[in-house]
From Swiss-Prot:
It comes from the Bacteria. InterPro entries: 4-PPantetheinyl_Trfase_dom (IPR008278), 4-PPantetheinyl_Trfase_dom_sf (IPR037143), ACPS (IPR002582), Ppantetheine-prot_Trfase_dom (IPR004568). It comes from Leptospira biflexa serovar Patoc (strain Patoc 1 / ATCC 23582 / Paris). This is Holo-[acyl-carrier-protein] synthase. Belongs to the P-Pant transferase superfamily. AcpS family. It catalyses: apo-[ACP] + CoA = holo-[ACP] + adenosine 3',5'-bisphosphate + H(+). Its cofactor is Mg(2+). It is found in: Cytoplasm. The keyword Lipid biosynthesis applies. Transfers the 4'-phosphopantetheine moiety from coenzyme A to a Ser of acyl-carrier-protein.
Amino acid sequence: MLSVGNDIVENERIRELLQKHGDRFLKRVFTDDEVEYCHKHKDPVPFLAGRFACKEAVIKALNLEPGQVADMREIELAGTNFGKKTLVIHGKTEKFFREKGFTGSSVSISHADHYSTAVVVFFKEPK
């Protein structure tokens, strides 16, 4: 069985949230490792936007209601620029993932001038 979620984020929206809320926004949405990774780039905004889109895509793939994910930091994307991205799910969100019987995931993130997008696929390994 597969479950797919996708999301698209306007990069400027993330830039505005950063300007308005600064570290408070970062600490509420991203893990320390995600923030560190994104800030290694000349412009961290597209990378933050891609990770934000990934988190939203996870929520859609799990078919969760907005209030069911208490902490966006429970959804973490680890990986390098061109290497494989690894989705790490913690806490309550991981519980939903396991309860639905999923055993693995695949993630793809893309950036364009004004938008970042993510697609997440959850799957169950055949027995």
